[in-house]
Amino acid sequence: MRNIIMTAALMVALTGTAQAENYDNTTVSMAAESATMGISLSTNDTSRSIDVYTMGRSLDFGAGVSDNGTNRDYSVSVGKTLDVLNVGPVGTYLSGEAEYNWGDTFTKSEMHFTPTVGGKMDLGLIAPYAEVDYMLKSVEGDFTSIDKATPNFTIVTKVALGTSTSLNAKLTNSLNSDWESTDKEVSVGLTVKF
């Protein structure tokens, strides 16, 4: 219980005004996960969202709702992650996700396709990883017309706080089509396994 209270205090400290001045959109999330399913609640400077998802299956599925106080958007997704090469505590992976989006901020529904390549390490209590993804999205209402959206570079450190609780600290660097930095976002998340 003490670890949970300390973690909650750390999350509040990391998302105070000093952090929000340095980055455009600081996110705090909490997730509860079983071996095959999870639910996540998150909030940032502009919106709140809830996501339900599966894990560890041949294909993973998800559904989400995001609300910014004025508009409400919905999404359903399917994805797959493949471990490519694992040597000791170091590994690499490829993943892909297709997401269908609709709601108040979309004139017509659109599809997002996100291929990702990443590297990870498992050091016991600490498990850092880094990944690069490149989102492709359809023109609203025309799923056959695909535009490049944005690449992202993400660095994450996952710290085990106990046997069933972990804290994730994430830095996401959004890039433009020339791979130059356009925005940085910090996220802090607490995950509880049951």
Locations of regions flagged by a protein language model:
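Gram-negative bacterial Sec-dependent N-terminal signal peptides
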Residues: 1-21
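Short glycine/proline- and aromatic-enriched beta-strand/turn motifs that initiate or cap beta-hairpins
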Residues: 16-69
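Outer-membrane beta-barrel transmembrane domain signature
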Residues: 21, 45, 69, 82-88, ...
